[in-house]
Amino acid sequence: MSEPIIVVRDLANRFGSHAVHEHLDLDVMKGEILGVVGGSGTGKSVLLRSIIGLRQPSEGSVHVFGQNLPALPPLERSKLERRFGVLFQNGALFSSLTVSENICLPLIEHAGLSRADAQFMAKVKISLAGLPPDAGAKYPAELSGGMVKRAALARALALDPDILFLDEPTAGLDPIGAAAFDPV
C-alpha cells in the first residue's frame, strides 16, 4: 500500500479558549476523494487552511507529500504549494481581472508560460470547468454565483495540481446550480 500524501497528527486549532480541533489525526491517500462534513462553524475551513499552510495550528503536525509545510524554507514551501489547487469558499478571484486573466496569472507567474500559451490554457480550463467560452472575457462581478464557483475551479485547476482542495464548492448555490456543479 502506498504512503499517504497528507498526514495530520494530533492537530489542535484554538481561538483563545475555544478549541476547534483537539487531537485530530487524518491520512489521505493518493487518488482518494475525501469529504469533510459538519455544521457551520465546526472547523472544516480551519482544517483546510491548516493543511494548505494558511493557518499555523496551535499544536500537532501537518505533512504533505512527506514534507512539514510550515517548517519549509520559503522557496521550497512555495514549490510545494504549487502542487495544490484550491477553490476557496468565496471563490477568491481578483475582482480587477477577467476570468481569463485570473487563470493566466498562476500560469505565467509559476509555470513560466508565455502570455499566448497561458491564454490558450485558460480557454482549456474554462471549458473543463463547464463555463461558456465568453466567460473568459468577463469580470467576477459580471458572473452568477455558480459561474464564479466554476471560474474559481478553472483557476484552481490551472497548474494541473496533484491535490485539489475544494472549500464548500456548492455553498450559496441554488439546488439546480449545485447539482450542475457536481459532474464538474
Give the location of each predicted region.
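Conserved catalytic motifs of ABC-family nucleotide-binding domains
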Residues: 160
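Conserved ABC ATPase "signature" region
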Residues: 67-68, 115-134
